[in-house]
Amino acid sequence: IDAAIKPGNSGGPVIVDKQIVGVVMQANSGGRAENLGYFVPPSMIRHVLTDSKDGVHDGFPDLGFRTQTLDSPSAKIAYGLDEDQDGVLVIKVFDDAPAQGILQENDVILSIDEYDIAEDGSIQLSEDILTDYKHAIDLHHPDETVAITFSRNGIVSTTNLPSQRALDSYSLVKSEQFDKTPEYYIYGGILFVPLNMNLIKRWGNDWSRTAPVSLLQARNEWSSPDRRELVVALQVLASDVTLGYHDWRNWIVQYVNDEPVRDFAHFAEMVKNNPAENLVMENKNGYQLVLNHEEAVA
């Protein structure tokens, strides 16, 4: 909306022609636009109120796939679309997700429910409103079914996908969490933490530019049963045990004694139960951090 939103306005009503059309959410404070604000539309308000009726917060659903737009005419031809067909390309279907076994990578989703998807991933929500196609999924509640029409090698099919409660994140970098005690593990004077958005946002409001590139790039990697979470050697406390590594920080641990790290709990277990004289940690580029285990736990 084109309106000045000031601190304290959040949660107040947005009124147009004497009718409440939404709830004030936030202002754009990035400095690139003036008097630009955002509000929660009625459809989302109704969703939250309906969700709260049973006293259990289920949130919004997720079908367990990710897509990219199909703006390229060459890409449309490559995936079997006709000239009058548009949609989004499925690039990832996650394990144990509702879409697994039904959708496949390289399928093209043409519509969700009654909404046709444009090449840029938008849907015509109403006569004067264009929005992202994911909004059509957000209109549902977990455990409801979502009708999806898709094209596979030029053959069009329709299916009903059961929706599930959205997971914390399908990314290796978990989303920001609140009201939860931070996890950490100290070994040999090195502070290890799980990589999540709480950590990345330590670099301030401009974290997308100032946070270490390796941590930012990890946000584009998908989790899997064999690799659910990343572990970061955040800081090295200077000591004889860590001599040679005092300037190492924000270092992602990929392996411990040649075994891939599955998640933070798995990392802590491997370190604690290390049977060898030395413990060798390695990142994806092959750089190694070696500590004498007996000295590290002393």
Segments (PLM) and residue ranges:
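Active-site loop architecture of trypsin-fold serine endopeptidases
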Residues: 1-11, 15, 20-46, 115-125
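C-terminal recognition in membrane/secretory proteostasis and scaffolding
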Residues: 13, 47-298
